[in-house]
Amino acid sequence: METKDLMYKRAYVWDKLNAEERKVCMDMGEDYKAFLNESKTERRCAAEIIRRAKEAGFVCICEKKELKAGDKVYYNNRGKAVMLSVIGSEPLENGMNIVGSHIDSPRLDIKQNPVYEAGGTTLLKTHYYGGVKKYQWVALPLALYGVIVKTNGEKVEIAVGDKCGDPVFYISDLLPHLAKDQMSKTMSEGVEGESLNILIGSLPVDDTEASDRFKTALLAVLNERYGITEEDFVSAELEAVPAGAARDVGFDRGLIVAHGHDDRVCSYASLAALLGIEKPERTTVGLYVDKEEVGSIGATGMHSQFFNNMVGEMIALMNGGVCSDISIRRALAHSTLLSADVAAAFDPNYPNVGDNANFAAIGQGIAMVKYTGSRGKSGANDAAAELVGKVRKLFNDHGVVYQTSELGKVDQGGGGTIAYIMANYDMDVIDAGVAMLSMHAPWEIVSKADVYMTSRAYHEFFVNYR
């Protein structure tokens, strides 16, 4: 072996692509932006995933009387989480190749009794969702999405702020001339959560003697447009997200800025990898789940039993309606999962928060993260060396550009994914996803080259991992 071959050197994806692959990479970037623009919330993302899956020949598992090799099925969990699967030729008890991502992102949720007026305006009270820097959400045009379930059970869809001609919404900030006290606070205290109130109106009713003139006028507008009353907010799920479409960044258009890259970029990469698979040996599964940003709790989060239930349903449909508990356990224990979540990338504006030899970089391919957690690996899923070796060999054998990463310097911070939850099923799990800048900001950055290479990595895992 030559001396130069002894050293491990990372590579840039762009350097490894030929002209045809570069075109495919840039075209995928355009498709990914279109995906993001239709997926501003977890509900809309789930709907877009299902729409694309149906176009590719997937059918709802609820419509199937039996399953056989090559069948393509999906499951819609309450409109907020999705499972896609292409049935393999091997028995499900032999295990599945699973890529698990999440489709929720940090945002501002609207409270259940949110409407009030003050200072000649009408506002909505919010409760932030996930790990946000609160100061990033002020002085920013916002769009409003969600559903309102009326007293009669009718569900009203809300989507305002992103179409041409739509109004936007806004959280005001304090002018610097009067911000002496605010500026003396820490960044986490400068904007309080209870101050993240969204401007939604400013016109009063004509009756100058009426009380709550501005609130009443706004409620009248909502009633005329959507047929709702104030009480209907009690049974509503509304989310404020940054207004605006995904855009290219840079003169060379190599990057994409958008809301929700975490973790819709890995969800998209997994979806693109899965839709073209026809007849795998091992059953392939794409998971697109909710509530990861707040602990993966609830019926649509990964802590729920919906995936176990779906594995049981698939086994039963493949075995004449028969499924035992041990069959489900074997199927899960013999599976391998790539926890498809984003990784923090080296930021040249903040170069001292990571150990750069063990920190991902933009444009260097899918980031494998052996362990997550914080401090002394608290809360981590720590993938076994044997698993890392198998995945590394898979990537090397199929020309996948990869890098390794962890979340910053020891004791600098930390975080987690769904990996540890899935490992509780006794399956092998490793984190592997797209490296990004400005994670959890209203607008985040990823590289088109990394989106392309991550999708290739997931495809090779789906089809060729054993």
Where are the language model's segments positioned?
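N-terminal hydrophobic/helix-forming segments and targeting peptides
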Residues: M1-R466
